Amino acid sequence: MQLNTIKPAEGSKKNRRHVGRGIGSGLGKTAGRGHKGQKSRSGGFHKVGFEGGQMPMYRRLPKRGFVSLTRRHVGQVTLNDLAKINLPEVDLLVLKAHGFAGEQINAVKVIKTGELKIAVTLKGITATAAAKAAIEAAGGKLVELA
């Protein structure tokens, strides 16, 4: 085998369709679009959700609920994450700066996954009962903001 003799597998390469290049090609004149009608015209095709004049599905179904603009987006942080930060005081801004809370998160809860061996003071952050016990056992504390 030599580089100049290598060929692709039979049937793996398919030629592109060249439409509108004469009747002998089989795709000339109407270019595979048929005669007349909306689909044959340039730019002529229905929009997404259009069902040919029938009442579309998105209008047949009732509206449900609403999106609250004041919803609390609560993120989860583990004890392992707090150990990785390795700072004496941690609040929401610190968690966001270290990538443990996303942009839309406006509250965080600590869950007990892993271990915490350093004393950490959490400001304005809630924790589960088990996580709170682990934080206090390591010499840390939770401070609630008023």
UniProtKB/Swiss-Prot annotation:
<dbReference type="Pfam" id="PF00828">
    <property type="entry name" value="Ribosomal_L27A"/>
</dbReference>
<keyword id="KW-0689">Ribosomal protein</keyword>
<dbReference type="GO" id="GO:0022625">
    <property type="term" value="C:cytosolic large ribosomal subunit"/>
</dbReference>
<feature type="compositionally biased region" description="Gly residues">
    <location>
        <begin position="21"/>
        <end position="31"/>
    </location>
</feature>
<dbReference type="InterPro" id="IPR030878">
    <property type="entry name" value="Ribosomal_uL15"/>
</dbReference>
<comment type="similarity">
    <text>Belongs to the universal ribosomal protein uL15 family.</text>
</comment>
<keyword id="KW-0694">RNA-binding</keyword>
<comment type="subunit">
    <text>Part of the 50S ribosomal subunit.</text>
</comment>
<protein>
    <recommendedName>
        <fullName>Large ribosomal subunit protein uL15</fullName>
    </recommendedName>
</protein>
<dbReference type="InterPro" id="IPR005749">
    <property type="entry name" value="Ribosomal_uL15_bac-type"/>
</dbReference>
<dbReference type="InterPro" id="IPR036227">
    <property type="entry name" value="Ribosomal_uL15/eL18_sf"/>
</dbReference>
<dbReference type="InterPro" id="IPR021131">
    <property type="entry name" value="Ribosomal_uL15/eL18"/>
</dbReference>
<keyword id="KW-0687">Ribonucleoprotein</keyword>
<comment type="function">
    <text>Binds to the 23S rRNA.</text>
</comment>
<dbReference type="GO" id="GO:0019843">
    <property type="term" value="F:rRNA binding"/>
</dbReference>
<keyword id="KW-0699">rRNA-binding</keyword>
<feature type="region of interest" description="Disordered">
    <location>
        <begin position="1"/>
        <end position="51"/>
    </location>
</feature>
<dbReference type="GO" id="GO:0006412">
    <property type="term" value="P:translation"/>
</dbReference>
<dbReference type="GO" id="GO:0003735">
    <property type="term" value="F:structural constituent of ribosome"/>
</dbReference>
